[in-house]
């Protein structure tokens, strides 16, 4: 890694907001380290600033810990300037309803909180040293559903984003 250029970690970067966020940092010359459940899109591998992508299940605490270890290895003692906790989930029940207080399996609530709340907490702690070295910032991507009732967000998602 080039310690002269700034470095960012972006979660949930294989598509959507996370992918576009990663592209924005790339366009500005930052080195990026990303993770998502899926492999990075092939066009990302062609960009020399895309330092590494680590397939990670942020809903699994062991996988999160592995990502922290591997990403810190990629940093090689260099500072981290930003952590973008973007990954999130809003599952539906088997009946295609958003997971709410009165429907769905309670284990699904655990899964939502593991990914939407505990993973960002673990990542923030896991990168605290590198962030301090780079005087970095943590950005937790939440949702309007965490602040206001939203018809397309279930209770589990909304409450987990409020907690974050």
Feature annotation, model-predicted:
Residues 28-43:
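Conserved glycine-rich Rossmann-like NAD(P)H-binding loop of the short-chain dehydrogenase/reductase
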Residues 55-68, 106:
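The beta1-alpha1 cofactor-binding region of Rossmann-like NAD(H)/NADP(H)-dependent oxidoreductases
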Residues 5-6, 77-81, 131-144:
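Active-site loop of short-chain dehydrogenase/reductase
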Residues 94-110:
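Substrate-binding pocket helix/loop in short-chain dehydrogenase/reductase
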Residues 124-125:
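A short, exposed helix-loop element centered on a Lys and neighboring polar residues
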Residues 14-15:
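Conserved glycine-rich cofactor-binding loop
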Residues 90, 102-105, 137-163:
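Catalytic loop of short-chain dehydrogenase/reductase
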